[in-house]
Every structure is written in C-alpha cells, then in structure tokens.
Curated annotation (Swiss-Prot):
The gene is purR. The keyword DNA-binding applies. This is HTH-type transcriptional repressor PurR. The keyword Transcription regulation applies. Homodimer.
Length: 336
C-alpha cells in the first residue's frame, strides 16, 4: 500500500507539499499540483482517514441505529440519510439491531470506539436500557427519529402519529363509514398508542362508537395481517373499513381478503399508513397516510450536522405532518 512518502518521492517534492495539495491547505503551483496528483493516480494512493481524524478531530462518519433495515418504511428513510451523507462527504455506518439489547449495546460501544461524529437513532423499541446507553455517551451528538426513545441529550424528530391516525379515520368517516376496524402493530409501541388515540378522536368527533373487538393487534408484518383478515372474515358482523397502521399489513390484509372473495373496496375498504413506494402498485392502488420518509432522513442528517457544529445548543424537537394520499381502496358510501 502506497504511503505519502512514496507519492512525494515519485513527484519529486516533499511530503509537506503532498499534504498541502491533497488537503488544499496552502497555495501550491499548478505544475506541482499536477505532478502530485499524477503520482497519487499512479500509486493509487489513499490518505489515511485515521491520521486525518486524529489531526482534525473528526472522522466524517455517522452511525445509524435501526430496528430492522429490511422494513420498507425504515429502508426508505435510510436511503434518504445515505444519499445526503454521500453528498456531504460523510460515511454512514448502518447498525441493524433487530431490537436486541446486546446488539444495541455492542453497536453503540463500537460506534463510540470508531469516534463517529454523531449517531442517528431509529429504533422502535422504547426501552429504558437503550435510553440509558445513549445518555451514557453525552459527548456524541445524537438525533432520535420517528419511534425512538425520549432522551434529554438528543434532538428529536416526531412523526405525529396521533394526527396521522386521526386523518386516516376522518377520511373514512367523511365517506360514510361508521363501522371501522383498526389493525395496529404491537399495542405497547408508542406510535401504535398514538394512532389509536387519533382513531378514537376521529370516531368521537363523528359521534361513532368504537367496537373494541375490532381493534386488532399485529406486528407490522404481513403474517399477522393475514391472521387479522381471517378474524374479520369469521365475524358475524364485519366492519366496512379497516385502518391498517402500516402499508405492509394493508398489503397482507388485502391479499387475504381478496383470496377469500372479498372485493376491495366494493365489499370492504382499506386505508394504510406510510405511503411506501410499493403502495401505488398494489391492486388496487392503496389509499394511505403519507410520511415524508426521505425528507425525514434529510432533515435528521441536517439537524445532526448542526448538533455536531454546536454541541451546547439546547435540545430541539422537530415535527413532521402526515397527509392523506388518495387512491382506490376506499369506497365512498355517501354516493351509494
């Protein structure tokens, strides 16, 4: 592996001159710059990031903790973060924790050892252990995204799940639906509790009674949506609409209902949450609640950069606002 001395020897200059050319820290004659860069090219020389980080006290590296990078919502946010990291010359270290305490602990320790400039946190498990681990590294700038834990030492981006739950339910009630079911994720998750609160608020506003038996628990994956669909099919009295707390479960639910001869939206309406890229390609295309996932990723990275530059800034909370994307899975009963 070539060293800076090899470059200097081939270019016929000092190592100091090579350093100034590469780092653009001092004027160097154009002809000399060309010699140095030609030597760099010939030797395939790459400056030591470790040495540079020791000198500049920055690694230009960001760590990101996520529960599951294969989750379609998370993957689109990650794509936004990675895109903006690349544009700004930062490397992203993605840590897929699976919600496992040991992995969270080990990844946070590893990121600290690698002297990352900051950490983005997007973990759906609201554990005290994770909060304590993050708080133990007060010197590392952090931004908590979406479902992440509350911590006094990190900026936070909140997705307004209560508002999203309200908008989805109001969309259904405005179209004449009075018998509405919910397919939630795990009830213990804060986002699910908030969406249920929004659902209840919209139902109360429309002076409708909530059927508690129609609030079903899933896990944000297709398998539990299929089980929920089977429960709905077996009901003596079925809801006219189902509000799914993410698009993945909406897909699983719709698929199972259609397999059993229940037409969407003619026989049952479905509204999702997230507006993942696949939602418009469902059959029929899914009406859903849009979350600006790539903008969340961009904003999180920009906020983290501000925190890196000003570590003493008071804690900030940024709100995102969901909106309805109207497609073809909700029947308007007022026109029947």
């Amino acid at each position: 592996m070539a060293t800076i001395k090899d470059v200097a020897r081939l270019a016929g200059v000092s190592t100091t001159t090579v350093s100034h050319v590469i780092n653009k820290t001092r004027f160097v004659a154009e002809t000399t710059q060309e010699k140095v860069m030609e030597a760099v090219k010939q030797l395939n020389y790459a400056p030591s990031a470790v040495a540079r980080s020791l000198k500049c006290n920055t690694t230009r590296t960001i760590g990101m903790l996520v529960t599951q990078s294969t989750n379609l919502f998370f993957s689109e946010v990650i794509d936004g973060v990675e895109s903006y990291c690349y544009r700004q010359g930062y490397t992203l270290i993605l840590c897929n924790t699976g919600g496992i305490y040991e992995k969270q602990r080990d990844y946070i320790r590893m990121l600290a050892e690698k002297r990352v400039d900051g950490i983005l946190v997007m973990c759906s498990d609201l554990t005290q252990e994770l909060q304590d681990m993050l708080d133990a590294h007060k010197d590392i700038p952090k931004v908590v995204m979406d479902w992440g834990p509350e911590t006094s030492h990190a900026d936070k981006i909140i997705d307004n799940s209560e508002e999203g739950g309200y908008l989805a339910t109001k969309y259904l009630t405005d179209r004449g639906h009075t018998e509405i079911a919910c397919l939630s994720g795990h009830f213990v998750k804060a986002a699910c509790q908030e969406r249920i609160q929004g659902f209840r608020r919209a139902m109360a506003e429309a002076k409708l009674t909530v059927n508690e038996d129609w609030i079903l628990e899933g896990n944000f994956e297709c398998d539990t949506a299929v089980l929920a669909a089977d429960k709905i099919i077996a009901m003596d009295k079925r809801p006219t609409a189902v509000f799914c707390f993410n698009d993945t479960m909406a897909l699983g639910l719709m698929s199972r209902l259609q397999q059993k001869g229940i037409r969407i939206p003619e026989d049952m309406s479905v509204i999702g949450y997230d507006n993942i890229e696949l939602a418009e390609y469902f059959s029929p295309p899914l009406t859903t609640v849009h979350q600006p996932k790539r903008r969340v990723g961009k904003n999180a990275f920009e906020i983290l950069l501000e925190r890196i530059k000003d570590k003493e800034h008071e804690r900030r909370i940024f709100e995102m606002h969901p909106e309805i994307v109207e497609r073809d899975t909700v029947k308007d009963l007022t026109k029947s």
